[in-house]
Amino acid sequence: MTRIISGLAGSLKLTSPAKATRPTSDRIRESIFSRLESRSVIDGARVLDLYAGTGALALEAASRGAALTWMVERDGKAAAVCVANLKIVAKALLKEEVEFDGKVVNKSVSSFLATPGEIDFNLVFIDPPYEITNDEIIADLDALKEFLKDATVVVERSSRTDAPSWPAGYTLDDEKSYGDTVVYWLSA
């Protein structure tokens, strides 16, 4: 069961598609968000969640104070789950009289990134299916530059794959392993 861990929508249960996604575990999400909060990154953030799955990363950010979250998901069933979860979190935030802008984009990441950016995002989550290659992630990161302004980029990968060679314009700030998962912290 995936849930919002903390913030104004904390403890709300999110829906998940049957097998189309691999949601980030609560333990890893809590670690990611503790670090983001300690760096004062979340409050008022403009968040982009690529390969969104259930939308849990973006919606956790919304619960903790992000002003805007866009979730990009190619799979139609998973995108529908993102929409349902967005409604759950938006309703909870509305009860608290918090204004929040959320959007689900049902496109492939490469198609989304090929369109001109209308927003400068300052917090990006990239948690692709493990079968996505490092070359594809590097291509995504190259295209993503047009959408970023003083951004923190969090990339989740299988610990069984080599670390990507980060493209120009990105600095690897840190990496941390959690069993089968490794989280990379980039600044752009």
Model-derived segments and spans:
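Class I S-adenosyl-L-methionine-dependent methyltransferase catalytic core
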Residues: 1-188
